[in-house]
């Protein structure tokens, strides 16, 4: 279990914007709180923060739809991700999702 953080706190920690598609997130979205972090789309639960990681044979960004279908509170997205991002998904846009994950771990 992760200490509770809201998306706005996370964005401050990572010095990164919170977005919905290409527009800034509204105040309600910024206040969304997540208590768990998951890098595995198969283990996601409602209210989690999804951090899609890239590997040699996969890219977690390919599972953003699965994350939305279980009701995640938001996701980190790599700035260079050119694929589909569900419109309703609140995202924190970072240069590298693995590095951001490490920053979160150090802060908590």
Task: Walk through the language-model features, giving the residues of each.
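Short, basic phosphate-binding NTP loop
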Residues: 2-108
């Amino acid at each position: 279990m992760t200490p509770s953080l809201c998306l706005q706190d996370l964005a401050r920690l990572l010095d990164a914007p919170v977005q919905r598609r290409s527009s800034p997130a509204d105040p309600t979205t910024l206040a969304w709180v997540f208590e768990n972090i998951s890098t595995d789309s198969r283990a996601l639960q409602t209210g989690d923060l999804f951090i899609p990681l890239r590997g040699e044979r996969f890219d977690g960004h390919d599972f953003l739809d699965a994350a939305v279908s279980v009701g995640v509170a938001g996701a980190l997205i790599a700035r260079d991700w050119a694929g589909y991002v569900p419109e309703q998904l609140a995202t924190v846009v970072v240069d590298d999702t693995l590095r951001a994950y490490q920053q979160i771990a150090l802060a908590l």
